[in-house]
Design a protein with these regions (language model features):
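Short strand-turn-strand beta-turns centered on an Asx-Gly dipeptide
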Residues: 107-110
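Intrinsically disordered, low-complexity linkers and terminal tails enriched in Ser/Thr/Pro/Gly
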Residues: 1-93, 105, 115-259
């Protein structure tokens, strides 16, 4: 039989995510293309061959001492990172975290999922296009990367060979720095068979359902109603030992027991 576990914590957490898995983390290896011209057509798609591109680990850039892969001071840089998923049916949420200087556009399997400080959504900026304004990276001074909740649809992902592609842009050709440190994290309905867990750099909400009320320690009456307000069940809270449950056995029966 199936059941839903809800904590009466008063936190009001409605997420069905039970596990956070960072599939693209700081320090991962990427393939990249220096922005001396536009990259070849189709570079954002999963079937594009990037075997001739350069490779390096994130972050990418120059000038801020937050760059594991230092690139020349060009207007842009284009990066690609592949990742696999055990089961796309297990995915409930996708979150992109990104620290950047000065602008970026991010794509997941060819679909634009986020951008900041450059161009028009749906139109890829040219390699020599600058950002609207200066934007400084923050992680190298102890800050937290920007967070983007992705509107997730099941056709956005596949089990094998997903591609996160990002183009990062400077403000102008005389810019003193550039930075790009991306993270991609999946909220899962259950833990995968070989979990990695969330990045140590990031913070995520609780991974259980939490009601927006608490149960008083001295006990009180709990009432379950349906959407139209009809009472389905009533039970008085009692002291319950650790790792023990209290409820009706069998389900829907009249007897309340510890089990």
């Amino acid at each position: 039989s199936e059941y839903v576990l809800v904590f009466a914590s008063g936190e009001g957490q409605e997420s069905i995510v039970q596990h956070w898995e960072t599939v693209v983390d700081w320090g991962d290896e990427w393939n990249y293309f220096l922005g001396v011209t536009n990259p070849p057509t189709g570079w954002i798609h999963s079937d594009f061959d990037d075997s001739e591109w350069l490779s390096g680990v994130s972050g990418f850039g120059y000038g801020d001492n937050d760059d594991a892969t230092i690139i020349p001071p060009y207007m842009s840089n284009f990066v690609r990172k592949s990742f696999d998923i055990e089961s796309i049916d297990n995915i409930a949420r996708i979150i992109l975290h990104i620290d950047y200087d000065d602008a970026f556009v991010a794509y997941l399997n060819g679909i634009e999922i986020a951008r900041s400080n450059i161009g028009t959504p749906g139109i890829a900026p040219n390699y020599n296009e600058g950002s609207y304004e200066w934007h400084e990276a923050v992680m190298y001074t102890g800050g937290y990367p920007e967070e983007y909740e992705i509107d997730f649809e099941s056709n956005m992902l596949v089990n094998e060979g997903n591609i996160l592609a990002i183009q990062v842009h400077n403000y102008n050709q005389t810019s003193s720095d550039m930075s790009l440190i991306p993270f991609l994290t999946l909220g899962m309905l259950e833990e995968p068979s070989e979990p990695i867990g969330p990045s140590e750099t990031l913070n995520f909400p609780m991974t259980n359902l939490h009601a927006d009320f608490k149960i008083e320690s001295e006990g009180e009456t709990l009432i379950l109603t349906n959407p139209v307000g009809e009472v389905i069940d009533v039970v008085d809270s009692v002291s319950v030992p650790t790792d023990v449950s209290f409820g009706r056995q069998p389900d829907g029966g009249s007897e309340l027991v510890f089990f």
